[in-house]
Curated annotation (Swiss-Prot):
2 X 14 AA repeats of P-[MV]-G-F-G-[DS]-E-S-G-A-E-L-E-K as annotated region, ranges: 303-370
Protein name: Low-temperature-induced 78 kDa protein
Biased composition annotated in UniProt, kind: Polar residues: 169-187
Induction section of the entry: Levels follow a circadian cycle with higher levels during the day, in a calcium ion-dependent manner. Triggered by water stress, osmotic stress (e.g. salt and mannitol), diacylglycerol pyrophosphate (DGPP) and abscisic acid (ABA). Pretreatment with lanthanum, a calcium-channel blocker, prevents mannitol-mediated induction. Induced reversibly by low temperature; by both acute (2-24 hours at 4 degrees Celsius) and chronic (5-6 weeks at 10 degrees Celsius) cold treatments. Levels are correlated with the rate of root elongation in the cold.
Acidic residues bias (residue ranges): 59-73
Keyword Ribosomal protein annotated: no
Keywords: Cytoplasm, Phosphoprotein, Repeat, Stress response
Biological role: Involved in responses to abiotic stresses. Regulates probably root elongation in cold conditions.
InterPro entries registered for this protein in UniProt: LTI65/LTI78_PGEED (IPR057059), LTI65_LTI78_N (IPR056605), LTI65_LTI78_NYQTKV (IPR057058), LTI78/LTI65 (IPR037491)
Biotechnology: The cold-inducible promoter of RD29A can be used to improve chill-resistance of crops by triggering the expression of given genes in low temperature conditions (e.g. potato low temperature sweetening).
GO cellular component, as recorded: cytoplasm; cytosol; plastid
Record-listed Phosphoserine modification sites: 626
Compositionally skewed regions (Basic residues) per UniProt: 29-41
Lineage of origin: Eukaryota, Viridiplantae, Streptophyta, Embryophyta, Tracheophyta
Amino acid sequence: MDQTEEPPLNTHQQHPEEVEHHENGATKMFRKVKARAKKFKNSLTKHGQSNEHEQDHDLVEEDDDDDELEPEVIDAPGVTGKPRETNVPASEEIIPPGTKVFPVVSSDYTKPTESVPVQEASYGHDAPAHSVRTTFTSDKEEKRDVPIHHPLSELSDREESRETHHESLNTPVSLLSGTEDVTSTFAPSGDDEYLDGQRKVNVETPITLEEESAVSDYLSGVSNYQSKVTDPTKEETGGVPEIAESFGNMEVTDESPDQKPGQFERDLSTRSKEFKEFDQDFDSVLGKDSPAKFPGESGVVFPVGFGDESGAELEKDFPTRSHDFDMKTETGMDTNSPSRSHEFDLKTESGNDKNSPMGFGSESGAELEKEFDQKNDSGRNEYSPESDGGLGAPLGGNFPVRSHELDLKNESDIDKDVPTGFDGEPDFLAKGRPGYGEASEEDKFPARSDDVEVETELGRDPKTETLDQFSPELSHPKERDEFKESRDDFEETRDEKTEEPKQSTYTEKFASMLGYSGEIPVGDQTQVAGTVDEKLTPVNEKDQETESAVTTKLPISGGGSGVEEQRGEDKSVSGRDYVAEKLTTEEEDKAFSDMVAEKLQIGGEEEKKETTTKEVEKISTEKAASEEGEAVEEEVKGGGGMVGRIKGWFGGGATDEVKPESPHSVEEAPKSSGWFGGGATEEVKPKSPHSVEESPQSLGSTVVPVQKEL
């Protein structure tokens, strides 16, 4: 009857999913499952916990499959019709209210029982152990045949779970309790024995993390197995606390490796976690160069090589390798400080690097450092008398700085000579240098420090091939001579600058005041002007203004070279006449003076002009040529006359004072307008076009060197 009635139900369910041809097989499976579920229910009520123990094994073995089996088994209860109306009519017709009771049990137990199509009679107690696997396969087959069962089963499971929630909860609890008993008898007992042995091992001998991890994995499988059974009831099985204890022991043993074996603790009392952390930092700094480059000549591996000295001090020394520590404050021993910190005292660094073959760890480092400092001092004193010609002061003052700068260079260069090298240096650089790979070079390094000392004073990079190439007699005088030569040149230039301005200003002054461009012919003026223009480099804006004004206005080619040419050349009247024709006309003088007076608004210009012109006339060109320096000094000291004014203009010192005076000087002689190039530059340019026209070539060029040199 069930078969005939169920097909329409399946058709309803399968039509939406288009699986009609499997209806009969699916219904048969449902019927069988339902019958088995009923039998289970009866057996549960009758036998109670006996079934629970047997079924617990099945649940424990395939507890993971319960989720998959539950939806499939519960298809029949889904038919009860509570979850969905579509399922309601067919399910109710097929299965009477007895099925409602059935699904409750089936939700928890039919999962294993579904797959057993045969042995319904014997299924009561024997089937569960075998049924789980068989049902799993059968359920999958049903899934293949009728994919509709999954949604139905899920719905039915939910419904049954809702209806018989109380019963379902009770049954798993009993199962779990039974499993707890079973696990305590089986797995926990074995685990307890194993764990007991393991504990003894952990206590007696420190086990490495790897071994314990393997043990933990094995135990974790057991703990997971038990946790699935025991977690819902929150009742711990016998083996779980033991596992927890074992983990506690493992944590204790984890600390032991950090503390290292007992012998290291005895030998190196200060090392433990700090030493481990330092090893990490140390490896990161060293890279592949490894600790073998530091411990000393023995080349012993890092931890062993330091047993020779106190572990605390060496441990402090090595962190300084990491470029972050101040060597003096960190180590408290400059002699042992490795030479790579770049932040500790440079003299100490250079002294250690040069005198200590390992660059650190040398007990005599302090003495060598003192010797090196003394040598540096003696080096300064040694060459100071030779450098009296201007080199002594600069060299003596600069030497400390230069020595510090070169100590860095010496560090890198001499570290390369060290037998084992240092951390920052690649091996390919260290190889090929004299002494690389040798056990010790203490004999060579003192001489090396001597040579480097000289090079340090000279500011040159020390060479590493031969030691006798850099003797103080050979190298130092060169440096001193070069510097002295440059200094002598500077003195000469200063003399020229001081002298030439006097000549140029003086001759220019007189020539402009007297109204002629000196005795240089016009053609010569052009050449002189061209050469001077090429050399022209104004110093500042004021000089630029003066330069422009002078180039446009100045009738004479006064520069230092111009003065010399004036002396040697025949005093030609052509230049003088040329200037006189253009510049000495009274009309131009008046017009120019009027223009300047209007702009500068200075009264009494004519009177001042007359007095100044008289002073100018008193001085002759011959006197200017013979008494240049004296006349200039006298005039300047007196502060009067054209000389003072011109000195102020070109010297820039009395620019403001000259401005009021400039108008008369310009007015006095358009001839002398050339020297006037300072404060009234703007006014002068428009006012003396004639002067610009007359000798543009020679005009400004002469004054230009004067400005430059001043």
